[in-house]
Amino acid sequence: MESTLSASNMQDPSSSPLEKCLGSANGNGDLDSEEGSSLEETGFNWGEYLEETGASAAPHTSFKHVEISIQSNFQPGMKLEVANKNNPDTYWVATIITTCGQLLLLRYCGYGEDRRADFWCDVVIADLHPVGWCTQNNKVLMPPDAIKEKYTDWTEFLIRDLTGSRTAPANLLEGPLRGKGPIDLITVGSLIELQDSQNPFQYWIVSVIENVGGRLRLRYVGLEDTESYDQWLFYLDYRLRPVGWCQENKYRMDPPSEIYPLKMASEWKCTLEKSLIDAAKFPLPMEVFKDHADLRSHFFTVGMKLETVNMCEPFYISPASVTKVFNNHFFQVTIDDLRPEPSKLSMLCHADSLGILPVQWCLKNGVSLTPPKGYSGQDFDWADYHKQHGAQEAPPFCFRNTSFSRGFTKNMKLEAVNPRNPGELCVASVVSVKGRLMWLHLEGLQTPVPEVIVDVESMDIFPVGWCEANSYPLTAPHKTVSQKKRKIAVVQPEKQLPPTVPVKKIPHDLCLFPHLDTTGTVNGKYCCPQLFINHRCFSGPYLNKGRIAELPQSVGPGKCVLVLKEVLSMIINAAYKPGRVLRELQLVEDPHWNFQEETLKAKYRGKTYRAVVKIVRTSDQVANFCRRVCAKLECCPNLFSPVLISENCPENCSIHTKTKYTYYYGKRKKISKPPIGESNPDSGHPKPARRRKRRKSIFVQKKRRSSAVDFTAGSGEESEEEDADAMDDDTASEETGSELRDDQTDTSSAEVPSARPRRAVTLRSGSEPVRRPPPERTRRGRGAPAASSAEEGEKCPPTKPEGTEDTKQEEEERLVLESNPLEWTVTDVVRFIKLTDCAPLAKIFQEQDIDGQALLLLTLPTVQECMELKLGPAIKLCHQIERVKVAFYAQYAN
């Protein structure tokens, strides 16, 4: 029985038809990165692992295929047309000097070797076009002013400069492919032609099922209902060609022999016709194949002997023979088998196939050569073998350079494909390097395998962090130092905790931390104590108190990063706006922390948001980290901490407990409270506002949030409590109100309108019977009449004020909402903005997915920060937002 495989089976630039296998016999078990990978389950971290093992990561430059995959499709020397900086209505031809991702370094033609005017631009947002675009669109081509006098005839200069040059591809400068790299162009569903593993002149179309950083999971068309024959190949594999290539070269388009019996010939024909039509409709850009290496001619002849890595079991090197030559590019190599009924294993090779070696290579490099099956001697000897079989050795010049190691050395770490389970990538260690071959130890496998032999240019090996960068599971080692205890992030129900625990007051400048018993633990400094969710503590404006109460009372003990990541995930899910909390957590950092970056997710309204958050790694920083997070979320610093709070919180946060919304709706409660966890000797005694505190006042306004978000948390009593708390917070910033009025920077404040005196100049509502102050009066005291008028404006029907002109203007600005802003979609928000004098900003709302609830949360600082608006337009926009808020409270707050 003879089986034939492609030489790419041996992890070569032609990498191999490897089947994906995770939990299924055929090697195609599904991997759901959303459900969590082994990285998440074990909390494996490359940084800690390298630190604890004392190993180093293989250099990124050693992975040739990965380096190529992240290169831009734009090449130095390409020409394009770009808008002039000083005169954007005109354009000029520029040359690409270098690239960095989607950034291009350009130089206007005419500057020669002068680099002083070089400039960077982003392909996605810059005004770039292919050469010839200006002529087609009647645009003006004009050289920059700095070199305008350098030549008298610029037309002649351009003709001379552009002759023989390459223009940047139009499809990469315009349309959906703009700025995308080669691997980004390959999408799920893309169709490609795949060379048969047995016959170099036969192809069949495959569909891309997954694209993991250029590593493609491929499925033959016609086999959509089964994954048994799926293969994994890197997109640079020579066996992959654009659809139509086979026909152009007059090769056969037939399904492989192993799948042909699965369907009738007529069915295969219909499948092919449909695939060709689909491929013509959505062709794969040719830029995907621009880095494919051209195959050089080989010099092998039938009967030549060589040594080769066993393609089915890449753990051994065996004697082999050239058994067939197809043409000057392809030949067949078969592993020698001396048994009477040999089971021949063959592979398709080309001149640069990986894993084929000259005779005596193993002897020269001190590597064991596995004798052929049926060989009678004890130790294999090529001299005796030649005498017995009279074979000819393949001359050394037939092989590529066999001594190039690409910088790999012993004990380096990397990520590698499990040859018995090609859908699985593992942590791997370089055991030894011989010439251009490496022996890898794969860690963490359920069924251990011998050391895997791979070429240094294999496309089945990847640098440290590649899986994480591509959101793909990585099989971690079974026992790393940091994982000595497998009970990580144990979530304990409340009933398992003792009923009462002594409580000590936590000083604001100290972090109380339980004693860690690290007996028997090599890695105690990375062990986090039990963290408690003290749901009785004040939850602040971001978090839903009801959802907090539903969380388990404790998490841990376990590895610091994993425990804290679990706690932060729970906190995010307990938020009114998970995405907003995620954004706040991004800002928590300290230069003195020993941290690592972790990706956290927030799901809201069917969308998933991701952000990188810094999490401390060592136990001595956990308490400080918890307090910093709580401070950022404006909640009690003991909301989650290493200390269990049974009854009374040491921070006395009960004074901030959320009470009935109706209580504040009808009454004016004047208190001035500092943020929790910060000492303020004057707490509870409002002080007159002072001008020099304006900067601080803006910060306070930024930190206050609208109670509008609280309505999304649920209904009934809980919702009312959340609203009341938000309003209570608003009164705390009252002392800064008059400062802000002076420069009108609180236009966007998201406070409840009835909870503070309004600024009649810019925040007018049709229901507010407040007279506009005289123009020369820049400051207004916060007397009781102003406060009561604000309340009455919310509670009572509008009464006619004395100033009829002011009333008329207020009536004009009064907004009547047809629907509740809390229920507005992004489209509704965009539609509203377009009806205002801020219509040009509607695009920003569309791009940032701002719905009604998010709209009600916007404040002047957030508008300036997130929308990158100057003060004038920001105030103008915030005035419109304030109109919505006023109308919301007037129409829907009841």
From Swiss-Prot:
Composition bias (Basic and acidic residues) maps to 769-778, 792-807
Any one GO MF term held by the record is: transcription corepressor activity
Database matches in Pfam families: MBT (PF02820), SAM_1 (PF00536), SLED (PF12140)
Give all residue intervals belonging to the SAM domain: 824-887
Residue ranges for the region (Disordered) are 1-39, 672-813
The UniProt entry, under SMART domains, shows: MBT, SAM
- List, as start-end ranges, the regions of compositional bias called Acidic residues: 717-737
Enumerate the subcellular locations listed in this protein's record, separating them with semicolons: Nucleus
GO CC, alphabetical: aggresome; cytosol; intracellular membrane-bounded organelle; nuclear body; nuclear speck; nucleoplasm; nucleus
Residue runs in coiled coils: none
- Biased region (Basic residues) positions are 687-706
Its GO biological process annotations read: negative regulation of DNA-templated transcription; negative regulation of gene expression
Q: Which sections of the protein are MBT repeats?
A: 44-144, 152-256, 266-372, 380-477
Q: Where is the composition biased (Polar residues)?
A: 1-17
Q: Its principal location?
A: nucleus
Keyword annotations for this protein, in alphabetical order, are:
Nucleus, Repeat, Repressor
* PROSITE patterns, alphabetized: MBT (PS51079)
Tell me, how does this one assemble? Answer: Interacts with YY1. Interacts with methylated histones H3K9me2 and H4K20me2, but not with H3K4me2, nor H3K9Ac.
Q: What does this protein do?
A: Transcriptional repressor of HOXB13 gene.
The name of this protein is: Scm-like with four MBT domains protein 2
Q: Which organism is it from?
A: Homo sapiens
- Supply the source organism's classification: Eukaryota, Metazoa, Chordata, Craniata, Vertebrata
